[in-house]
A protein has these predicted regions:
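Accessory beta-strand-rich segments of carbohydrate-active enzymes
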Residues: 41-46, 51-53, 66-71, 94, ...
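Solvent-exposed, flexible loop/coil segments flanking beta-strands in beta-rich domains
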Residues: 70-107, 117, 260-313
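Exposed aromatic-hydrophobic patches
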Residues: 29-35, 150-156, 296
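Solvent-exposed, conformationally flexible loop/turn segments
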Residues: 25, 40, 160-161, 288-290, ...
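Activation corresponds to long, low-complexity, non-globular regions
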Residues: 201-298
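Non-cytosolic beta-sandwich-type ligand-binding/adhesion modules
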Residues: 1-16, 48, 129-131, 298-302, ...
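Recognizes extended acidic, P/S/T-rich segments that occur
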Residues: 1-42, 48, 52-58, 75-82
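Terminal edge beta-strands and adjacent linker/stalk segments
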Residues: 60-64
Length: 314
C-alpha cells in the first residue's frame, strides 16, 4: 500500500496504490501499478503477506522513499567550477575548489532535499556541517556514458535567517585522458529544493552567483594510467577553518565559472555509498633514502592518512 502522507497510510488509504492481495510466487521486483509519481515526491508505504493457509500478517512498519529527478528538464542548475583555463601545463597543480552560496529563509522549512551531481568527488556542507558520512562520493561511473547524482534530506541542517550551502570538490576520476572528460574539472551541479510549512517551494541552484576559492588540497600526478595515481598536496597556508560557515565574508572569493559538459545520461546512484569503517595505526615509520618517509600501516587498505605535525616556530 502506497500513500501520499503518513496520515493516509495509517488509515489504510492507499491513495497512490493499494495492490490488495496478489497471488504470486514473486517476492521481489513487483511492478508498480499505481498513480504516476512526480520528481521529488515522497511516498509512504507498508506491506503485508499471506501464508499458505491464508493467514494474514500484520502490516509492516511504515517506511518512506522519495522519487528522484525523473527528467533532464528537472535539473534547473548549471555545472560550475573554478575559474581556470581549459588547458594547463602538464603536471601543474590545480587546487580543488571550495564553492558556497548564502541565502535567507523566513522560517524553518518542512522539508529540504539537496540533489548533487558531481563530475569528480564532492562533500556537501550546510551551515558548517557535513550532511552525511559518505566519502569518495559519488560512485565511479563511465563519464562518456553516464554520471551519477545523490539526494540528501537536509531540512534539519537549515534554520530561519541566513544559511550557507557549500561544496568541496575533488578530482576523483574526472581527469583528462579518461573517456568523456573534456574539462580540467572537477565540476558540480546541485539544487536545493526547500518546502515551507505553507506549501511554498523555492530552489537554490548552482550558477555564476556562487562563490569559489581554492582549497588547501591540490593533486599530485595526473591519475590517468595505471601506476600514475599520484596523491595530494596540502597547503596549510590556504586553510580557512570557517570556509563553510554562514558567518564568513566571502566577498573576496571569485564568481564560479559555468561549464557545459557533453550531454550524457544523469542517473541516481543506486549503490551504497563509500563510508569510513575503521581507523588503523601505523606500524612503522622510517626515513626514505631519497627523501621523505615510509609509513607502514601493517596491512593493505583503501583510505588516507591523518598526521599530527609539530608546530613550526615563527
Amino acid at each position: 500500500m502506497l500513500a501520499a502522507s503518513r496520515a493516509a497510510l495509517d488509515k489504510d488509504q492507499g491513495d497512490f496504490w493499494d495492490s490488495g492481495r496478489v497471488a504470486s510466487d514473486e517476492s521481489t521486483w513487483i511492478r508498480y501499478d499505481g498513480k504516476a509519481l512526480a520528481s521529488g515526491q515522497r511516498v509512504y508505504w507498508k506491506v503485508r503477506i499471506w501464508g499458505d493457509a491464508g493467514q494474514r500478517s500484520p502490516w509492516s512498519v511504515p517506511a518512506t522513499w522519495s522519487m528522484g529527478l525523473l527528467q533532464p528538464t528537472d535539473w534547473h542548475s548549471k555545472f560550475i567550477g573554478s575559474v581556470r583555463p581549459e588547458k594547463h601545463p602538464e603536471g601543474a597543480p590545480l587546487p580543488f575548489p571550495w564553492l558556497r552560496k548564502t541565502f535567507n529563509l523566513a522560517q524553518q522549512p518542512a522539508r529540504a532535499v539537496a540533489y548533487v551531481n558531481a563530475l569528480g568527488y564532492y562533500e556537501l556542507y550546510i551551515n558548517g556541517k557535513k550532511v552525511d558520512d559518505h566519502v569518495l562520493s559519488p560512485a565511479v561511473s563511465d563519464y562518456s556514458r553516464r554520471n551519477l547524482y545523490v539526494a540528501h534530506e537536509v531540512a534539519d541542517y537549515l534554520e530561519p535567517g541566513k544559511n550557507v550551502i557549500a561544496l568541496w570538490l575533488g578530482r576523483g576520476w574526472y581527469v583528462r585522458g579518461h573517456p568523456g572528460v573534456v574539462h580540467d574539472g572537477p565540476l558540480v551541479r546541485a539544487q536545493l529544493a526547500v518546502s515551507m510549512p505553507d506549501g511554498a517551494v523555492s530552489e537554490i541552484v548552482t550558477d555564476d552567483t556562487w562563490r569559489v576559492r581554492e582549497s588547501p588540497l591540490s593533486p599530485l600526478g595526473r591519475g590517468t594510467a595505471f601506476g600514475d595515481y599520484g596523491g595530494e598536496r596540502y597547503d596549510a597556508a590556504k586553510d580557512l577553518p570557517d570556509w563553510n560557515a554562514s558567518t564568513l565574508d566571502d566577498s573576496t572569493w571569485q564568481p564560479a565559472a559555468v561549464f557545459t559538459p557533453p550531454p550524457v545520461l544523469t542517473a541516481a546512484q543506486m549503490v551504497e555509498p563509500n563510508r569510513m569503517i575503521e581507523t588503523i595505526r601505523a606500524q612503522r615509520v622510517e626515513p626514505f633514502p631519497e627523501g621523505g618517509w615510509v609509513v607502514d600501516m601493517g596491512k593493505a587498505f583503501t583510505g588516507w592518512l591523518e598526521i599530527a605535525l609539530p608546530a613550526i616556530p615563527k
